[in-house]
Amino acid sequence: MSEATTASEKTLMVLEAAMTHERFSEIVTAVNLPKATVHRILATLVERDFIRVADGGGHVPGPKILSLAGVAYDRVDVSTIVQPYVDDLVRRVQCTVHVGVLSGDEIIYLVRTDSDKPYRMPSRVGAAIPLHTSAIGKAILARLDDDAIERFVNRAGLPRRTARSLTTLEDLRAELADIRRDGYAFDREENVPGVVCIGTAVRDHTGHSNYGLSISSLALEHTEGQLAAMADDLNKAAADITHALGGDR
């Protein structure tokens, strides 16, 4: 490793630590570098507006880093980022895989990738579906507390999509408890008759579960137990996508 590379790595280490630690002593501990080195790097970062010294003396993100973050976020194409992980999951489970994004009280499909099965799911990219009738939606709801769930129900209602849709707050809460325990959610023909899914939530750089990943099949082809057997592959892909979107696995 060259001296230039070593210096670059030290600068990046200090910059990253300063994003999550305000106090100088905390930054030093996080990077495990000599105080003099950290002080010198911080001074350069402050001079270049990557770091700002707050009124209380703490280190906070400066205007340059905020500007770069905004530019980077504007250039993010989530569909492109997640597609390799979706393709890998499709190969593993040989089923249709969806990625959806939370939009108000609905899920919008961003990605749909089919397997080589002779049939196709009735879903389409850009379609909106209710949270309470979809595996992705219920997985996201399961990350909320009881008060937030009650506000959601009061606001959006629980309209019936099929004979199997959950239409009461009591039933929804009971299922969300199961989802929290298991780490994944089912759609038991609740959105489209004959279509079943297993899904889980995906966190992004905000730390919130704004996305979700699901595996879809026909009720005639896969039992609930067979879908549950895909949970490990599903959760691994979701963890990889979470990391790719800047979230913690």
What are the residue ranges of the model-derived segments?
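N-terminal helix-turn-helix
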Residues: 1-80, 87, 239, 243-247
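Short amphipathic alpha-helical signal-transduction/dimerization elements
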Residues: 19, 137, 141, 145, ...
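A structural signal for short hydrophobic beta-strand segments in well-ordered beta-sheet cores
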Residues: 51-52, 99-100, 202
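A cytosolic small-molecule/anion-sensing beta-strand core signal
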Residues: 55, 103, 211
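All-alpha effector-binding/dimerization core of bacterial HTH-type transcriptional repressors
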Residues: 70-118, 143-147, 155, 172-178
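Short, solvent-exposed recognition segments
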Residues: 119-191
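Cysteine/selenocysteine-centered motifs that mediate thiol-based redox chemistry or coordinate metal-sulfur cofactors
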Residues: 151, 156-157, 238-249
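Extended hydrophobic
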Residues: 168-238
